[in-house]
């Protein structure tokens, strides 16, 4: 169990000296943490923890003070594991976390992309919390079947909107009401002799992002997607020199990001 306290003071996100003297952001945070674990016989075990965090941010611009964030947040984490026998294991994982925006995301500074587009920082951007749950079944200590759900209130992403005073597109990180994802997946490892070692991951999920107030607009975007991932290791030579080739691929049928409806995405990489 521990308790800590943190105070950060940042002077001026602007690059001009006169603006540096007139803008100030202060952040205060404190948290307490408690964890317990227990084995119930030889089949069932449990670990649980809870973190309580207080976070506040004050912003002063040209003598005008405002409170950006003033929140108490609970972060529960738990792992429950039940071993029917070594060939059948059931596990429930619950986790939570917090993601803070980067320095440049909250810098109230305009960076031109071209004559018609700019990137603008958002000093009122809030950190977002994430809550995740997974129900996992492990078969023969090898194959994994899982169901998952991720809920992220105040999720942020870079979104475009039209400037009302001039003909420009503005790209700025914005907090959404929430992001929600849930689905099922399976992980299958296999080996072909001593030459090929591989792991295949298949998943299907529903993605959803919602924001009621977005520059006089609103959106509620959702999509069903499928994912395929394959990691491969090929042993080219076991004697000296020991040569191995890693070849990995990832494919997803689509995704959503705010107002965007993204098409299929894929990546591949190789290393020796």
Where are these regions (language model features)?
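Transmembrane beta-strands of outer-membrane beta-barrel proteins
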Residues: 1, 46-50, 76, 90-92, ...
């Amino acid at each position: 169990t521990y308790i800590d306290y943190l105070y950060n003071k940042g002077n001026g996100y602007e690059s001009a000296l006169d603006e540096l003297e007139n803008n100030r952001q202060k952040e205060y945070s404190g948290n307490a943490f408690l964890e317990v674990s227990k084995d119930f016989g030889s089949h069932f075990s449990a670990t649980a923890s809870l973190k309580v965090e207080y976070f506040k941010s004050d912003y002063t611009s040209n003598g005008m003070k405002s409170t950006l964030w003033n929140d108490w947040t609970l972060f529960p984490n738990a792992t429950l594991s039940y071993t029917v026998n070594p060939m059948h294991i059931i596990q429930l994982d619950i986790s939570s976390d917090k993601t803070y925006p980067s320095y440049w995301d909250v810098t109230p500074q305009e960076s031109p992309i071209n004559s018609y587009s700019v990137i603008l920082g958002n000093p009122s951007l809030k950190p977002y919390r994430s809550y995740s749950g997974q129900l996992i079944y492990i078969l023969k200590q090898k194959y994994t079947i899982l169901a998952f759900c991720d809920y992220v209130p105040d999720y942020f992403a870079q979104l475009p909107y039209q400037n009302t005073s001039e003909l420009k597109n503005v790209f700025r990180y914005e907090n959404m009401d929430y992001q929600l994802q849930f689905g099922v997946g399976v992980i299958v490892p296999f080996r072909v002799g001593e030459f090929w070692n591989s792991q295949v991951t298949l998943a299907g999920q529903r993605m959803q992002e919602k924001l009621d107030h977005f520059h006089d607009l609103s959106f509620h975007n959702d999509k069903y997607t499928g994912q395929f991932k394959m990691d491969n290791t090929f042993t080219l030579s076991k004697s000296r020199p020991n040569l191995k080739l890693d070849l990995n691929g990832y494919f997803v049928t689509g995704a959503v990001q705010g107002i965007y409806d993204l098409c299929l995405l894929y990546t591949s990489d190789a290393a020796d």
